[in-house]
């Protein structure tokens, strides 16, 4: 498999304890569950209008600046195929689908590497002639958030700054950017529904919308987007739970002598001297984690783990204690 297209979902069998995929493990809110059921039962074509209005209201933007997506990943591919940039810069280590999308249309890509001790970005490392820059905030797999002044440092005339905010529901922040791509996969546990959206200028949204097939966002995704955009309590509650679970997991890893980096998201990046062996031994015990050698700038020592429930996290810590 092309390493740019390797993602955590291929690493976990159905019966494995899945720390490879960063999807919140708790049940979905009842209102969301019912909306999904009602959408599947309906025989109507998808109608994006209510979801678009709800998202616009949440972000206090005109509806013309909202584009629903068949998962956040569609946004990167739409941008690449619609704009055909001259020179793309992608900040790494990070999600690799933007690289794959640009490669598919022949756009040269420069990988701008974060400083590895704290995974900070220096905007001066971005080539001056890059007319599109993609950066994660919060960043996957490092879990950090770039300060607003760093993101502003990417801005430049005739350049589009694209922020992958797929994990932003876990953090009460507005990442900014000319284009912001968000996902319902992570916090709302909707990986299979493929629901995301893009915020940008009305002109760019119109351009992107004109390049895709009709009804690309299914009825279940539209229903989910409408419900989730109006629900501010669930992200707040989950963020509080996550902070406690993540802190407990970090303490357990510290006790085992495992290096981690500070994270605001629902995952942690680990450094393990014998990472490839440990990944295999955990897999033999029915636990899937994400080896990170396929991320530019990382290698076999780096492993990403999701933050799951307290019992699941304790199971992982016990298994790590056995194999370290």
Regions found by a protein language model. Name each.
Residues 110, 114-169:
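Active-site phosphate-binding strand-loop segment of PLP-dependent enzymes
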Residues 243, 253-285:
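Conserved PLP-binding catalytic core of the aspartate aminotransferase-like
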Residues 80-103, 108, 112-115:
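Conserved PLP-anchoring active-site segment centered on the Schiff-base-forming lysine
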Residues 284-285, 296-324:
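PLP-dependent enzyme catalytic core of the Aspartate aminotransferase-like
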Residues 56-78:
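Short loop-beta-helix segment that forms the pyridoxal 5′-phosphate
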Residues 28-29, 178-259:
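PLP-dependent aminotransferase class I/II
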Residues 30, 274-281, 312-315:
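Short, conserved charged micro-motifs
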């Amino acid at each position: 498999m092309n390493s740019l297209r390797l993602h955590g979902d291929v690493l976990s069998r159905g019966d494995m304890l899945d720390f490879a995929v960063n999807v919140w493990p708790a049940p979905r809110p009842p209102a969301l569950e019912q909306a999904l059921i009602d959408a599947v039962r309906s025989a109507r074509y998808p109608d994006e209008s209510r979801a678009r209005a709800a998202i616009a209201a949440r972000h206090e933007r005109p509806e013309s600046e909202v584009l629903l997506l068949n998962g956040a990943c569609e946004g990167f591919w739409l941008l690449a195929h619609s704009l055909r940039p001259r020179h793309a810069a992608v900040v790494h280590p990070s999600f690799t689908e933007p690289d794959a999308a640009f490669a598919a249309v022949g756009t040269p890509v420069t990988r701008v590497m974060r400083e590895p001790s704290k995974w900070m970005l220096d905007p001066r490392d971005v080539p001056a002639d890059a007319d599109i820059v993609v950066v994660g905030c919060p960043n996957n797999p490092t879990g950090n958030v770039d300060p607003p002044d760093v993101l502003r440092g990417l801005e430049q005339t005739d350049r589009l700054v694209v922020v992958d905010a797929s994990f932003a529901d876990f953090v009460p922040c507005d990442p900014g950017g000319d284009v912001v791509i968000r996902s319902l996969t992570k916090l709302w546990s909707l990986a299979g529904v493929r629901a995301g959206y893009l915020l940008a200028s009305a002109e760019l949204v119109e351009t992107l919308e004109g390049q895709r097939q009709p009804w690309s966002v299914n009825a279940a995704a539209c229903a989910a987007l409408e419900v989730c955009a109006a629900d501010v309590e669930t992200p707040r509650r989950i963020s509080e739970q996550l902070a406690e679970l993540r802190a407990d997991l970090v303490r357990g890893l510290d006790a085992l002598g495992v290096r981690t980096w500070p994270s605001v998201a629902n995952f942690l990046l680990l450094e393990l001297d014998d990472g490839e062996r440990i990944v295999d031994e955990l897999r033999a015990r029915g636990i899937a984690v994400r080896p990170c050698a396929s991320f530019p700038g990382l290698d076999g020592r780096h492993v990403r783990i999701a933050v799951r429930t307290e019992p699941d996290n304790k199971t992982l810590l016990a298994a790590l204690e056995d194999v370290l």
